[in-house]
Structures are given as structure tokens and as C-alpha cells.
Regions:
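Bacterial N-terminal signal peptides that target proteins for export
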Residues: 1-13
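A structural "domain/chain start" motif
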Residues: 2, 22-75, 79, 89, ...
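Bacterial N-terminal signal peptides
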Residues: 11-21
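C-terminal/domain-edge helix-coil "capping" segments
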Residues: 25-39, 123-127, 132-178
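Surface-exposed short loop/turn segments
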Residues: 27-28, 80, 88-141, 147
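Extracytoplasmic/periplasmic, Sec-exported soluble proteins
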Residues: 38, 57-69, 86, 120-124, ...
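Extracytoplasmic/secreted cell-surface and envelope-processing proteins
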Residues: 55-56, 103-105, 152-154
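Sec-exported extracytoplasmic/periplasmic mature domains
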Residues: 74-82, 102, 137, 171-176
């Protein structure tokens, strides 16, 4: 009997944790690969940073954020057998983009025409995009992104965890090396 309660308690705790960390909207992970591209790439390097600002001071010139994204991508690509190089031309160039926007969700328990007991929730959602560009042809060969991410920029530990998780989910969508 206690084993059943313990299992049910664990399951309920897990659901609570997942619900609490998932934000107001479901997180979506997507990827596109250029058709016909054989992923025989062995090396990669980081492309130069964008000079275009996002307009969000939480992201623009935020070295903590960009360094964490780069470290997470480096770790995930190394786990897939890609070697990071600094000097010679690389097989792939890696680039990332990030945005944070506000969304409004209106919730009501009333299903009729008037909105009684309505409440609106304003929350931030983030999108993180990772691009892989063929180093020889300069063509985009793969793009992966996560959207509806709950961006936690003002807490370093949460930011690092969120970025690590998001990058891992994105890189899982990469085609296998051939």
C-alpha cells in the first residue's frame, strides 16, 4: 500500500515540477535540414556575432547569455562527434539567434459570451535558434529552434539550466552524421 502511495506521490510531484517549469504555453522544438545534404561534417567553428541588436537589453551585449549558449552548443556538438576548431576553415559555421517577446493569455472559467472572472497573464516567451552553415558553400544546411521557452535571464542558475536544456533539445533534432 505504501509503495503505491509513494509511486503516486512521486508521479504527482513530477507532474507538478513539469507543470511549474513549463510556463504558460507548451514548448515547441523544430528543425529543418536542407534536403539532399549528407551530414559528413567533422569540424565546426563559431560564425562572427551578429551586429544587429534584438532590441531587448536582456539579450543585447549580454556575455553571460551568449557564453552559456556557446558552451552548451559546444558540449552538445562534441557529444555528437564534431570537433571545434579555431584557425583553419571548418566544415560548419555555427550561429545562434535569440528573442524574447511578451504574450498575453486570457483565462476564464465562463464559456459564455461575457468574460466573468477573467484573468489575464502577461508572460515572456523566448525563442532560441541555432543555425549550421556549410563552411565551403556558405549555405544554411540545418536550422533548429525552440519556441515558447520560459526565459529566465535574471537568475543565472535558472538561465544556465534553461539554456542547457533548450540546446540539448534542439541538437537532438540534428540529422545523424553519415
Amino acid at each position: 500500500m505504501f509503495a503505491v502511495i509513494r509511486r503516486a506521490g512521486f508521479a504527482a510531484s513530477l507532474v507538478l515540477v513539469i507543470g511549474a517549469t513549463s510556463g504558460c504555453a507548451p514548448i515547441h522544438v523544430h528543425a529543418y535540414a536542407e534536403r539532399g545534404t549528407a551530414f559528413t561534417y567533422r569540424t565546426y567553428a563559431w560564425a562572427p556575432d551578429d551586429a544587429v541588436a534584438t532590441g531587448d537589453p536582456r539579450l543585447d551585449n549580454n556575455r553571460f547569455f551568449s557564453d552559456q549558449v556557446r558552451a552548451s552548443v559546444d558540449r552538445e556538438l562534441a557529444a555528437r562527434g564534431l570537433e571545434k576548431i579555431m584557425s583553419a576553415p571548418s566544415d560548419l559555421l555555427v550561429h545562434f539567434h535569440a528573442t524574447i517577446t511578451q504574450e498575453i493569455e486570457i483565462a476564464s472559467s465562463n464559456r459564455f459570451e461575457h468574460c466573468y472572472n477573467c484573468r489575464d497573464m502577461i508572460y515572456d516567451v523566448g525563442t532560441l535558434v541555432i543555425d549550421l552553415v556549410d563552411g565551403r558553400t556558405s549555405r544554411l544546411v540545418w536550422r533548429g529552434w525552440v519556441e515558447k521557452l520560459n526565459p529566465v535571464i535574471d537568475n543565472q542558475d535558472w538561465m544556465e539550466e534553461t539554456i542547457d536544456w533548450a540546446v540539448a533539445q534542439i541538437i537532438k533534432k540534428m540529422p545523424p552524421r553519415t
